[in-house]
């Protein structure tokens, strides 16, 4: 079977949108599954729907990478967006043609090509997703390195070369999953300007002529298909082999923080994508929306659902009690206190149900349960406290979620091992709670406590919550009642009592 390239694609009879040649307007640090299923997908749509006429040059940010494979396929790859949308199964295929090539800067020729792109009149945008560990300042990096080992070091080299070539400033879009990603990246570049003794003109160029934007990315990307049988079936169906085939969920939102005038610079509004990719002066409410609704829903229902006998997220969405509990928590307790358009938040919450119901992804509850102490504190506790502050009463489902958290960490504790705290659920099987060691030691020490004693010990542990939760009126009494309900009647019955 021939591997995908433009000639092979033409022979296969593919009749979707393809753009073979266009100016290279984007330099992208990162060539992995996520960026190719997300950023390059949006630019591909912009080419089709807005006649943007641009290509992305990818750069592998570390020595081992996909440059050779991507170049053998002339930048082409197949993307499947799979999931559930408005309750219906979706399985959409698209061949992405927004990528021109991929450079390996760890080879001398690849480094030279990266610098040639840096000095190009066509270049407008630099995008990055170099993982959470990518935006770091490494003082060992030098200007003359080929290349600098850190991503901010490479970016400083690229920008300095562009500055020396007398080219206009660029728009920098950071996608790394850290707080203030754009600001942190700019901070690192300024550190290299100091360390390398670069001139004040370049400092002005970076800080005034270039625009560093943070962004929030939201799409689950499982990546390649691992089932050899399905891969073989798709190759027969496509008429070509594609080792770069990528899979993402249907849902996708890219929130870029910056001056809204950038909506006129970027091609996405013109392409009719403004509900999916947009610029806002402050993305913190959107981050709050994602953390409180999407992540908060997970932590809010998963622990009790696991105790009730469920193992994957999708099955929970098919149970009327768990689904009803999750929706009540989101729509009655979380959404109303968010500082965003309420209808927009309700649509986001409805999309969460579709995402959790994805027929192509088996998302295990136990994988979500990792570090649930810090997760409940970051994702659920702010909604809980804000609800109490606004309404002067306890939110029913969020209050229950705290009891479910304690139940999960204390259900028939067997032993504390190197791997975690071994407990047992009503279904009969053992499970291992994973969290910081001190948290697990705490629950192991309190495994023989009665319910009121355990609840009081957990709620007064300020290392866990940053405060004494017994000071929230009625919370301790409600948690004792809820935990007793879970232990005596089961988590599903306890969830049902909230409806």
Tell me the role of every PLM-derived stretch.
Residues 1-499:
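Substrate/ligand-engaging "lid" and interaction regions
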């Amino acid at each position: 079977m021939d591997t995908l390239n433009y000639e092979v694609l033409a022979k296969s009879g593919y009749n979707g949108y393809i753009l073979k040649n266009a100016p290279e307007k984007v330099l992208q640090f990162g060539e992995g599954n996520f960026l190719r299923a997300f950023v390059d997908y949006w630019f591909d749509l912009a080419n089709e729907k807005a006649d943007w006429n641009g290509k992305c040059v990818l750069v592998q940010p570390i020595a081992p990478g996909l440059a050779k494979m991507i170049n053998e396929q002339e930048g082409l790859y197949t993307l499947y967006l799979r999931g559930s949308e408005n309750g219906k199964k979706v399985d959409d295929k698209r061949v992405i043609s927004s990528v021109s090539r991929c450079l390996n800067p760890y080879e001398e020729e690849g480094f030279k090509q990266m610098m040639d792109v840096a000095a190009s009149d066509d270049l407008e945008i630099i995008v990055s997703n170099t993982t959470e560990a990518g935006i770091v300042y490494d003082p060992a990096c030098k200007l003359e390195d080929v290349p600098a080992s850190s991503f901010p070091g490479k970016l400083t080299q690229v920008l300095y070369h562009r500055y020396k070539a007398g080219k206009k400033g660029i728009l920098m879009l950071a996608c790394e999953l850290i707080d203030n990603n754009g600001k942190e990246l700019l901070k690192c570049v300024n550190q290299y300007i100091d360390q390398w003794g670069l001139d004040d003109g370049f400092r002005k160029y970076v800080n005034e002529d270039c625009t560093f934007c943070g962004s929030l990315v939201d799409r689950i990307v499982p990546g390649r298909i691992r089932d050899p049988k399905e891969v073989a079936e798709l190759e027969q169906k496509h008429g070509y082999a594609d080792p770069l085939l990528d899979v993402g969920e249907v849902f996708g939102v890219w929130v870029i923080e910056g001056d809204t005038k950038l909506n006129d610079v970027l091609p996405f509004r013109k392409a009719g994508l403004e509900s999916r990719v947009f610029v806002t002066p402050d993305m913190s409410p959107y981050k709050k929306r994602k953390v409180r609704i999407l992540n908060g829903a997970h932590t809010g229902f998963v622990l009790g659902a696991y105790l009730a006998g469920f193992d994957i997220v999708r099955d929970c969405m098919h149970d009327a009690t768990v689904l009803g509990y999750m929706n009540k928590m989101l729509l009655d307790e979380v959404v109303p206190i968010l500082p965003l358009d309420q209808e927009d938040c309700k649509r986001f919450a409805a999309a969460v149900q579709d995402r959790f119901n994805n027929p192509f992804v088996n998302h295990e509850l136990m994988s979500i349960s990792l570090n649930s102490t810090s997760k409940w504190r970051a994702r659920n506790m702010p909604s809980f406290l804000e609800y109490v502050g606004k309404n002067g009463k306890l939110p029913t489902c969020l209050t229950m979620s705290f009891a479910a958290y304690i139940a999960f960490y204390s259900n028939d504790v067997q032993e504390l091992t190197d791997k975690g705290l071994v407990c047992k659920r009503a279904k009969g099987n053992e499970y291992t709670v994973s969290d910081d060691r001190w948290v697990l030691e705490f629950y192991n020490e309190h495994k023989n406590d009665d319910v009121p004693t355990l609840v009081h010990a957990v709620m007064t542990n300020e290392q866990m919550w940053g405060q004494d939760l017994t000071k929230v009126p009625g919370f301790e009494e409600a948690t004792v009642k809820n935990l007793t309900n879970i232990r005596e009647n089961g988590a599903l019955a306890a969830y049902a009592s909230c409806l």
